[in-house]
Curated annotation (Swiss-Prot):
Gene from which this protein is expressed: rpsB
Keywords associated with the record: Ribonucleoprotein, Ribosomal protein
Protein name from the UniProt record: Small ribosomal subunit protein uS2
Pfam families for the chain: Ribosomal_S2
Listed NCBIfam families: rpsB_bact (TIGR01011)
Lineage: Bacteria, Bacillati, Chloroflexota, Dehalococcoidia, Dehalococcoidales
């Protein structure tokens, strides 16, 4: 059964590409037509490509893998965080800090520092500090959480990265390629789909389109997680039955 349908994509405005003067020739196979100087994306192909991307995400999670959701453009920030939290995966929705993938050890030390500060705050250690110093540390926690809060529990490189806008996230894209982390991404008509392992042709500016695609990715994660729980329960039941027998 397809992940979505043309009607749902149309209602989200996923078919509207960029001005024809701002296109990438590699997107030609995903473009249906031109209308009023705008490229229109072929949603039949979007349905197929989204299905492939979601199946891949589902398989990665079924194998115990982790997904990192990335989208720092303003209209994607809140949506991306909501969907990543809904499926219990990592996210970056503010600024991509250079080295998150290529210098993960260094980034991990910053995360450890953040976690230590939060532990100290939770224990009430800050109350014993001068007011100004406690306030400064509180601000430091807030600052670090803005950039790292969405992935502070990530102890190794993610198994796949989902990106809302490859052009906006070019540093993340470059780091993923360098480290061999597969990429799933929404690709608008100004993007090069060849740079993505699992491209999903779609408007990447409209909030409704971003919400739709992000939610489908999260659904694919949740579906895999639920299937794993069922398998675990069945395995436990079989083991108990064998023991009882």
């Amino acid at each position: 059964m397809p992940t979505t349908n043309i009607k749902e994509l149309l209602e989200a405005g996923a078919h509207f590409g960029h001005q024809t003067s701002r296109w990438h020739p590699r997107m030609k196979k995903y473009i249906f037509t031109k209308r009023n100087g705008i490229h229109i994306i072929d949603l039949e192909k979007t349905v197929v490509m989204l299905d492939k991307a979601c199946n891949y995400i589902n398989q990665v999670v079924s194998d115990g893998g982790k997904v990192l959701f990335v989208g720092t453009k303003k209209q994607a920030q809140e949506i991306l965080a909501e969907e990543a939290k809904r499926c219990g995966m990592y996210f970056i929705n503010q600024r991509w800090t250079g080295g998150i993938l290529t210098n993960f050890h260094s980034i991990q030390s910053r995360i450890d520092y953040l976690v230590r500060l939060e532990d100290q705050q939770a224990r009430g250690d800050f109350s014993r500090l001068p007011k100004k110093e406690a306030q400064k540390l509180g601000e430091e926690i807030a600052r670090l959480n803005r950039t790292m809060g969405g992935f502070k529990e990530m102890t190794r490189l993610p198994d796949v990265i989902f990106v809302v806008d490859p052009i906006k996230e070019k540093i993340a894209m470059a780091e993923a390629k360098r480290m061999g982390v597969p990429l799933v991404a929404m690709v608008d008509t100004n993007c090069n789909p060849d740079e993505v392992d699992y491209p999903v042709p779609s408007n990447d500016d409209a909030m409704r389109a971003i919400k739709l695609i992000c939610s489908k990715m999260a659904d694919a994660v949740i579906e895999a997680q639920n299937a794993m729980k069922v398998t675990e329960v069945e395995t436990t039941g079989e083991a108990q039955a064998e023991t009882a027998g």
